[in-house]
Amino acid sequence: FVNYCEGIYVGYKFYETAAAEGLIDYDKVVQYPFGYGLSYTTFDSSIAAVEDDGEKITLDVAVKNTGDTAGKYVAEIFYEPPYYNGGIEKATANLVQYAKTEILQPGEAQTLKITFRYEDMASYDSNGIKSANGAYVLEAGDYKINLCSDSHTILDTYVAKVDKDVIYDDAHDGARSTDQVAATNQLTFAQGDVTYLSRADGFANYAEATAAPANHSLSAQALADYASAATFDAAKYDDPNAVMPTTGANNGLKLADLAGVAYDDPKWEQLLDELTVNDLFSLTADGGYHTVGVESIGLSATEDCDGPTGVHSNYNPAAGPSYPGSVMLACTWNQPLAKARGEQIAKECAEINCAGWYAPAMNIHRSAFGGRNFEYYSECGVLSGLTAAAEVSGATENGLICYVKHFAFNDQDNYRQNNICTWLNEQAAREIYLKAFEQPIKAGGMGVMTSMNAVGPVWAGGCKALLTNILRDEWGFHGAVITDAVVSPWYMDGNLAIRTGGTKMLAFNITNEFYRDLNSVGTVTAMRNAAHGTLYALANSFAVTRAVSVPKWVKTTYAVDAVVAIILVAWEVCAICKYRKAKKEDEGTEQ
């Protein structure tokens, strides 16, 4: 197990807040603040103007190159919310948005427009201080909007005033504008009996919260919640009143007919009726680096590929070039560059018929010892999320399904294949770890890969609270949810995955025993729902729409090859004819 005992105080959020509370001497502990960067030149920047309508804030940030060398500048916007001792936990520095200039020559200036919503500064009240069942809360008070060169160095400030609490729940002010339903506590079972770090009274519980765990046993409730192939009980998930869905119908629809059609359009039910039980089984169970073809609906088989640093495949030798690691991309603080990488990845995938990309990887640099930190963007959920949203948008707009991974709380690799239990409170889950996934999903992402670890006692790939309640119901996600590689089938159970929000298994060596009762109403219904998500993603990918055209250089190469081939054939024909003519003349002379 692993305890996220630090709560929301991850990375710079701890160091900045701990220094403000007098727990640490910042200059003795921190060498380079988060967001720090070097340049060959110098810049002046300030907040030149502010538009504030009470719903969103737009800053005009004036930047001027005051040095002797051309360069770019990043305007970083952090906010410091009002904190009330013993109340909702809040860090003193929180990245909310950023922008980067073009290349500025010496003496050249540029004004950046940076916009964000008030609700982006809300904190999640998992302890029911302001909302009984948990909610995002924008507490009354002064919010310092700081233009910074890094998390510690403030260059200019605008103070936004909130006159009264805004509570984003059904009993008060309704859901946030980006949510389909109001967020409420969904992950209480993952909190466990851990003591979480609190800012109250100047981090008075620091020693207790950071001490070695005293308890190494699951509670009775955690044992009851624990799920595996051995403990799976379909009755906990299946509707006893459900009737067997229609299968094998001849409705004359093809998947291409559903491109661009809304997820809940009745046409989808007609298409799903055409699938046989074997089709449903193959689409959901046989998902290792590919999606099977289904002739009856005109779906050709497609491939999926890894990973965050480029187009790589264990089964297709036509891999693309490797790119710098995602952490390097995040270090550029350059959203247009991230989008361009997504666009290029999509084009490379289209050339080798890979409709799915197992990337980007969204987990957090919780510590420097993360085994796959090079795949992940940052210690900051917002920087990770904004970078990924740009990259995923670039890829999705060009027809590629991005399976953002590993959903969720997979921030170490040791024991992950042994169903390691991750214990954390819901405020940390939502403000740090899920924030990174939330932004690319809400930007139009069509795919998710779950993780091997457990959320508290529940495998992430079979966690309804995560895959249905948060991902689908709250964030409005429609698409494909694949498991991580099924290397531990004793707990990575397909029966559970397809009933809790998963759509296909990254599995191999599939047999008919993969699901307990393949022909039961519950299993067929679950497979149908799962196939809907996968097919919806494919219908809006270049697997069907071919949104990404063949590059011009490929077309040119084909044309040149064809012309050269024609010339060579013509030359060969002429050579043969000339040879035969000469031979006949020689034979005539001999006679």
Regions found by a protein language model. Give the residues of each.
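Glycoside hydrolase catalytic-domain context in secreted enzymes
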Residues: 1-132, 136-151, 173-591
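Short beta-strand elements
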Residues: 153-176
